[in-house]
Structures are given as structure tokens and as C-alpha cells.
Amino acid sequence: MNITIVAPYCSLPSEPHFNRFWYLAELLSQSHDVLLITSNFKHYDKSFRRPEDAEAASQGRLKVMLLEESGYSKNVSLGRVTSHHRFVKHFEQWLENCRPGEQDVVFSAYPLIATNLLLGKHKARLGYKLIVDVQDVWPESFSSVVPFLKKVPHNLLPFASRANQAYRYADALVAVSQTYLDRAKEANPNVPGEVVYIGADFPKLDAAPAKDFGD
């Protein structure tokens, strides 16, 4: 089976942060051909990856592809909007060049909203099943930056209709919490859904040396 994972915020093995998308990519590549698509920009430290980083992370049946974005210095900024737009444009170009049958399943992180909308629009042409993994609820989470949005019903928020359409394109839904899954299922109630909480790598925890913090 050919599986594509779309995860703009994914960390690679040489980087300090662990996440489910790399874990899933490694696990699936044991028996499937896996393409992991992520950004050349590292959200956590605001630096850029090099093409060699993708080459080093690719192994066996797992291939890593970096899409270019312009980067940003602040998480809440016009620069981030511009950077995401650039990533989405490159993703759209890649998707338009794909041929039917190249992917059997696409597992896509949400957000971004736009990448999931594109995947939904191309799904029938390319013939894959789309699984959307809800990591955060946009636009609802914008209320942490603009508090008055908490008073607005979520379906009246800016971009709510785009969010609902992204959820509706999914053939199955995964989310990091029951609350997030419920939100996605509100828009797309008739597909399978599963909560998979953010976890930890227990072997690494067990191998870590104990530290005495005193009294």
C-alpha cells in the first residue's frame, strides 16, 4: 500500500521534539511505502531545514519530502500567514502533478485547513482515502489570541465554513482529544472516528537517568 502523511509541523529524527507523525511513518514503513510531506521550516525554533535533512531521514520504504515556506519569527503574525500560504501553494502544485493510484491512503494533520481542503478536492480524481488527524481546532483556538471570539458560536467564526468542509472531506477522523473529535464529527458524523491521545515514548523514558532534585 502507498501511504502519504501530510504533517507541516512534523519533527525529524535529528531534531529534539518527538511527535506522532514520525512515529506513524516509521511504523507504517515496515510494511508499506510511505511518503512523509512536511515543511522546510521548523516551527519550534524558527529555523530552516536543508535538503540533506530530508535525505538523512529517508530510509528504506520511508521517504521524506520538504516543501518550501518563507518562515516567520512570531507564531501570531502576518509572516506566519504568508509562510503558510507559500507552503500550501507548493503543496497544491505537488498534488496537481500526482497521478491516480499513486496514493492509497493519505493521513493528514489538521491544521492546516487549506491542505485538507486541497486533499479533499483531489480525492476523487486520485482515488485515495483521506484520514484527517485533528491536532487543534481552527478557528476556535484563535480565541486564545482574540478573547472576544469565545462569545461567538463556533459555526459563526471566521473560516468556520472552511473548517467544516475540511472535516467533511475525511473518510475517517482521528483527534488528540474527545472534544476535538466531537467538533469534527459535528460536521462529518457518519465516518469512523477515534481519539488517540498525545503520548510518550516509554522505552526512552525508562532509559533516561534518574535525577535527584533534593528535598
Can you say where each PLM-predicted feature lies in the sequence?
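N-terminal subdomain of nucleotide-sugar transferases
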Residues: 1-59, 172
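A short, histidine- and acid-enriched strand-loop-helix "catalytic/donor-clamping" loop
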Residues: 10-13, 100, 114, 128-150, ...
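An aromatic- and histidine-rich active-site surface loop
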Residues: 14, 80-96, 105-126, 132-141
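A conserved catalytic-core segment of Leloir-type glycosyltransferases
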Residues: 36-98, 196
